[in-house]
Amino acid sequence: AHPESGLAHERSNGGAETATIGGSGFGVMAIIVGIERGFITREQGAERILKIVRFLSDKNTDSYHGMWAHWMNGKTGKTIPFSRKDDGADIVESAFMFEGLLAAHQYFIKDNPTENRIRGMINNLWRQAEWNFFTQGQDVMYWHWSPNNGWAMNHQIKGHNECHIVYILGASSPTYPIAGSVYHKGWASANTFLNGWEYYGIRLPLGDNNGKGGPLFFTHYSY
């Protein structure tokens, strides 16, 4: 993890300062597992999570309508472009981050200063995430937005793939929820959503027929 932010590094060759938001969400989940398996103490895990949420909550850390970029500088909190036009919010990577943060919110429930701060900061971050902004007023969600390039990436999120968690979190937001029609007409509308074929005697409900439902990370990332 990055020594100042606590965020996960982007692979071994991503540079000393490049942190990945989605991978950091997985890291938060791994910290909880590490506590349960006895690899670290609850107190050690709580301090690591607190470092992450402090960094994400800092006013100098870039966020866009409550979402983060795919990559950011783990020291300064500034966005590192993933590609030429992908230099702002990535709601899929942000959803993976929130997946971990919300699990931590429900795990660290003791009444002590550290765990109280963790829950309070995560709750603030969760309530600031503007999921409905990323629909552009349409019945589908868009993967990217940036102040420099707006909606230029123009990547609609449709299923079935690793992005299901985006719609789940968007629908459950207490402050900026998406409408039900966004799920049904957006995520569930693609011809790669429903399957129903049998492979090796197992009926597959969702996923692309050509790829036997797709790779396992389609399921792993959201569930």
Describe each model-derived feature in a short phrase.
Residues 1-19, 63-72, 171:
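Low-complexity, Ser/Thr/Pro/Gly-enriched N-terminal "stalk/linker" regions
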Residues 62-94, 107-223:
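Extended ligand-binding clefts on enzyme/binding-domain cores
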Residues 28, 46-57, 98, 119-130:
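Hydrophobic core segments within long, regular secondary-structure runs in both alpha-
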Residues 28-36, 99-106, 167-170, 223:
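Short glycine/serine- and small hydrophobic-enriched flexible loop segments
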Residues 22-26:
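Hydrophobic alpha-helical transmembrane segments
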Residues 3-10, 39-45, 65, 111-118:
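Surface-exposed patches in mature extracellular/periplasmic domains of secreted proteins
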